[in-house]
């Protein structure tokens, strides 16, 4: 199946309650697949095409207030429009899943794949001090799995979760193992999970619930911020996910996520045939970033190469983790160009080994 | 006991009660200025929800603007929306919980400027929600700047020489525009300048909530309102200014009273 179609299929099967979205290339198949599947007839899942990405994310905000599982998807320019609503959801501590199938920017940019929204996704993307859990799928299977995982994390931390895919993964066709259809949560389950904060109508035996990110008292607002930061610290302690490939004996390590990591896997094979001991660290969570494993290898290897489809964004997070202990270089292409494994191997030799 | 206390005790006997605060309004002192219409409209909404017995089903969506704190006063569940996005937020709530009662409460900047797109499309979809629109022709919370509904010649913080058509365009009669949309079931313009008007406004708000229960489409109630602080007039002068200047531009009355249009009128033939 195609990566974008799998997002829709996983949403239906994991019992998602609602999807709100607006068409944008290269991810329009998500909503098209949902509309073709007509899940409202089977499970009652709501699927609605909004008038804009702004409206989509605020529909998600409203629907998430009910304690139900709600999601949207878009691509880079659309995610910029959603930044307001994502910030509000982070501030109001509402769970949801947001898929960004990235394309090249800035501006209208291109419809070709890119990873240029790394900073936007991992540093919050909107105004205020907040972070999202950011999951970076490198296969169609992970597109599927991260929808399911995304909802788990969204409700564990009461936070928006972003699946940061790119045009390659969105359009890629691969075999995928789908989960069995799960029922949507019942009202009783929702009451148990979210009953302490959800706005479903004020029952006689409880105080009114108000979902807001507003607080005029600076001392309380600071406490709210500290609570968010504690949450992010807990994510850093408990949710870091990565894959380390052939790193045990490595003299050099490449760091790459999403489709760039797929290319680097091939580069590892090519370089090792040449006798270059290179490994690959693939961050699966971009926030929380796998800084510990990188810091550990920083004292063991001769250098890191960050490979990204952008101008060098993740490289800064690697440098922070490495903290000056070894060399950190960047190689990437922009504008929708996807480099070949040989091109990456050449950069590895040129920038890191001989550079 | 003083004579005064005796008299007060005589007066507050239950059998003398002719009017009481709605049980849905709490005792918090409202932050609204003297002469502001918000307090009256809050009271009407609280009364309607109480009288219809829908407190446990109702979710309010408060805006950005003076009424951002509406959630402090009416004892129901609330979601506070970003500036202008209340109709989208209400859409999200209503779509996943169609059995609940959902309303937005928005000012003119929120509903008719920054949130114009969300307003139009929610009404055009015929969302089964109630929208309460407070039009006082000025931005109250940010300190009295020009609103989309500010009248020509009206002085505000950003139109110190009065609103100028060449520079600022025209006052937006958004309610007339919304009445044209097939998704609208009930569109009305009310005010609360005297007891008779307050009674009519309450009837309109109640009707709007009843229309939601009947799933007839969007019910939209504009309330032409005062902003004494923004207009720099006392409450009595504000009412007079509203009657003399606002009512001719924003005439009161029903603009649409039916239900959302039959899809057949808009369908392809083949």
Residues covered by each model-derived region:
Chain B
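Short, hinge-like loop/turn segments at secondary-structure boundaries
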Residues: 76-79, 122, 147-151, 237-240
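Conserved thiamine diphosphate
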Residues: 20, 147-214
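Active-site-proximal loop->helix
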Residues: 116-121, 141-155
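Glycine-rich beta-alpha junction loops
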Residues: 64-66, 136-138, 194, 223-230
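Flexible, low-complexity linker and terminal segments
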Residues: 1-18, 27, 213-270
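Thiamine diphosphate
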Residues: 1-140, 203-207
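Structural motif
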Residues: 57-60, 100-103, 128-132, 176, ...
